Swiss-Prot record:
It comes from Salmonella typhimurium (strain LT2 / SGSC1412 / ATCC 700720). This is 3-octaprenyl-4-hydroxybenzoate carboxy-lyase. Its cofactor is prenylated FMN; Mn(2+). Its EC number is 4.1.1.98. The gene is ubiD. Pfam families: UbiD, UbiD_C, UbiD_N. The keyword ATP-binding does not apply. It catalyses: a 4-hydroxy-3-(all-trans-polyprenyl)benzoate + H(+) = a 2-(all-trans-polyprenyl)phenol + CO2. It is a peripheral membrane protein. Prenylated FMN binds at I178, Y179, R180, R192, W193, L194, R197, G198. GO terms for cellular component: cytoplasm; cytosol; plasma membrane. Pathway: Cofactor biosynthesis; ubiquinone biosynthesis. It is an enzyme of class 4 (lyase).
Length: 492
C-alpha cells in the first residue's frame, strides 16, 4: 500500500503496521491515567503508534500516538519523509498567492500544481461507513466511549482529537477545527474554542444572524490522517480543509451529510457526534493539564448537546494527551514547521530558515534567519512573522539572526544574541497584543505583550562603532590538518 493512496484511518494503520510503526496492546489498560503514562513514555522514546485493544471497562479500542513522530506526520500528509513537507508548503504558498504563467514553458512547469488542484472538490456519498451504526435520543451515551482522563487533577474525561465541523450563516464553506471537549453528561460536552478560531467565529455570526436558534455542530472522531492534518495546517482562506486533504491524499475527500443537520462529515470517520449548541448554555471548563506543562484555569464555554452518535462497525476511538513538550502536538509542530517555511519565504524571500522550538510550546517562540539587506530589516521581518499568518498570533518571542546562524542550534542562536545584541537598542516590546488564553503569565487573559530580539549584525545607521569580524579558519591549513588527522592518532 502506497502512503499516497491510503483511503481511511484503517488503511493508514495497516500501512503503519507493515512498516513497524504500530504496536497493538492486548493487555487491559485503563483510559484513566494509564494510557497517558504508556503513550508518554513511548512518544519520548520515538516509539510507534499504539492501539489499545482492551481498554478497561470499554469494548472499543483506543488509538494513541498516531502522529507521535515527524515521520508519521509526513506519512499522513502523503510524503515519504519530513523534508518532503517543504513541497507541501510550496504548494500552499502557490495556492495562497497563485502567479499566472509567464509563458508557454512556464505553463507546462506549473501543470503539476494545476493538476493537483483538480483533486480539490469533495465527493458526496449517499451512505457512508461512519453511519453503519446509529444511536439517537435516549440511546445516546457518550460514557460508552473510552474517553481518556490524562492527568491526575483533570476535571473530567476529555475528547482531544475531535474534528469539529461548523458553518456560519453566510458561508458556503464549512470550517474544520480541533477543539478539546470536556465530558459532562451522557449527551453533553463543553466545546472549548477560543474566540478567534473558526468554529467560534461561525457561532458568533450565527448568534447575530439567527438569535435564539440552535447552532448545528458535528464532530468527527477517527477521520483519515489527511483530513485531520488539514485542520491543523495553514490552509489559505479560499481553500477548504477537505479540499486540502484531497490534495495530500491524491484523491477527493469523501463526505456524507449528517442525519440531523446539513453539515458534511468525513464519510470514513470512525465516529460522528451530531448535535447543537443552545445559545446561552455555558458551563465551566477545566482545569486540564495542557501543552504548556501546567493546568489551565477554569473558564466558561458553550455546551454541545449530542443528539446522534453514528459510527462504523468495530469503531476505533482516536485520542491523545497534551502535556509539557514533547507531546503529540509538539511533534506535529516540528513537522508542520517545514510547511511554514516556504509560505513565509513566498512573502519574505529574505528569510532563509524559520524554526519553532518544541520546548517553546511549538508556537510561543520563533527563530528566524535571514539575508539582511538594510538597517531595520530585522524588525520588518519580526513584524511580518507576527502579522502574516494567524498561526503566529500568539508567538510571544521572535529572534531574528543572520543567515550564518543555524536557527535550529541553540549554541548558534545564543552566541548571536550575546554578541550581536544591545538589550536597549535591539529589543522590541509590543504591548496589548493577542495572547493565548492558556498563557497565565500574561497580565490579562488573552491580552499581553510580545518581544522581538534583533540578533543580526548591525548596519550603518544602527550603530556608529566598528563592527566585529567573525573568526574564520584558514581553509588551506584546515585541509593540511585533515590530511594528517588520522596519523596524529589523538583519540586512539
Amino acid at each position: 500500500m502506497d502512503a499516497m493512496k491510503y483511503h481511511d484511518l484503517r488503511d493508514f494503520l495497516t500501512l503503519l503496521e507493515q512498516q513497524g510503526e504500530l504496536k497493538r496492546i492486548t493487555l487491559p489498560v485503563d483510559p484513566h491515567l494509564e494510557i497517558t503514562e504508556i503513550a508518554d513514555r513511548t512518544l519520548r522514546a520515538g516509539g510507534p503508534a499504539l492501539l489499545f485493544e482492551n481498554p478497561k471497562g470499554y469494548a472499543m479500542p483506543v488509538l494513541c500516538n498516531l502522529f507521535g513522530t515527524p515521520k508519521r506526520v509526513a506519512m499522513g500528509m502523503g510524503q515519504d519523509d519530513v523534508s518532503a513537507l517543504r513541497e507541501v508548503g510550496k504548494l500552499l504558498a502557490f495556492l495562497k498567492e497563485p502567479e499566472p504563467p509567464k509563458g508557454f514553458r512556464d505553463l507546462f512547469d506549473k501543470l503539476p500544481q494545476f493538476k493537483q488542484v483538480l483533486n480539490m472538490p469533495t465527493k458526496r456519498l449517499r451512505g457512508a461507513p461512519c453511519q453503519q451504526k446509529i444511536a439517537s435520543g435516549d440511546d445516546v451515551d457518550l460514557t460508552r466511549l473510552p474517553v481518556m482522563t490524562c492527568w491526575p487533577d483533570d476535571a473530567a474525561p476529555l475528547i482531544t482529537w475531535g474534528l469539529t465541523v461548523t458553518r456560519g450563516p453566510h458561508k458556503e464553506r464549512q470550517n474544520l477545527g480541533i477543539y478539546r471537549q470536556q465530558l459532562i453528561g451522557k449527551n453533553k460536552l463543553i466545546m472549548r474554542w477560543l474566540s478567534h478560531r473558526g468554529g467560534a467565529l461561525d457561532f458568533q455570526e450565527w448568534l447575530a444572524a439567527r438569535p435564539g436558534e440552535r447552532f448545528p455542530v458535528s464532530v468527527a472522531l477517527g477521520a483519515d490522517p489527511a483530513t485531520i492534518l488539514g485542520a491543523v495546517t495553514p490552509v489559505p482562506d479560499t481553500l477548504s480543509e477537505y479540499a486540502f486533504a484531497g490534495l495530500l491524499r491524491g484523491t477527493k475527500t469523501e463526505v456524507v451529510k449528517c442525519l440531523s443537520n446539513d453539515l458534511e462529515v468525513p464519510a470514513s470517520a470512525e465516529i460522528i457526534l451530531e448535535g447543537y449548541i443552545e445559545p446561552g448554555e455555558m458551563a465551566p471548563e477545566g482545569p486540564y493539564g495542557d501543552h504548556t506543562g501546567y493546568y489551565n484555569e477554569v473558564d466558561s464555554f458553550p455546551v454541545f448537546t449530542v443528539t446522534h452518535i453514528t459510527q462504523r462497525e468495530d469503531a476505533i476511538y482516536h485520542s491523545t494527551y497534551t502535556g509539557r513538550p514533547p507531546d503529540e502536538p509538539a511533534v506535529l509542530g516540528v513537522a508542520l514547521n517545514e510547511v511554514f517555511v516556504p509560505i513565509l519565504q513566498k512573502q519574505f524571500p529574505e528569510i532563509v530558515d524559520f524554526y519553532l522550538p518544541p520546548e517553546g510550546c511549538s508556537y510561543r517562540l520563533a527563530v528566524v534567519t535571514m539575508k539582511k539587506q538594510y538597517a531595520g530589516h530585522a524588525k520588518r521581518v519580526m513584524m511580518g512573522v507576527w502579522s502574516f499568518l494567524r498561526q503566529f498570533m500568539y508567538t510571544k518571542f521572535v529572534i531574528v539572526c543572520d543567515d550564518d546562524v543555524n536557527a535550529r542550534d541553540w549554541n548558534d542562536v545564543i552566541w548571536a544574541i550575546t554578541t550581536r545584541m544591545d538589550p536597549a537598542r535591539d529589543t522590541v516590546l509590543v504591548e496589548n497584543t493577542p495572547i493565548d488564553y492558556l498563557d497565565f503569565a500574561s497580565p490579562v487573559s488573552g491580552l499581553g505583550s510580545k518581544m522581538g530580539l534583533d540578533a543580526t549584525n548591525k548596519w550603518p545607521g544602527e550603530t556608529q562603532r566598528e563592527w566585529g569580524r567573525p573568526i574564520v579558519k584558514d581553509p588551506e591549513v584546515t585541509a593540511r590538518i585533515d590530511a594528517i588527522w588520522d596519523e596524529l592518532a589523538i583519540f586512539k
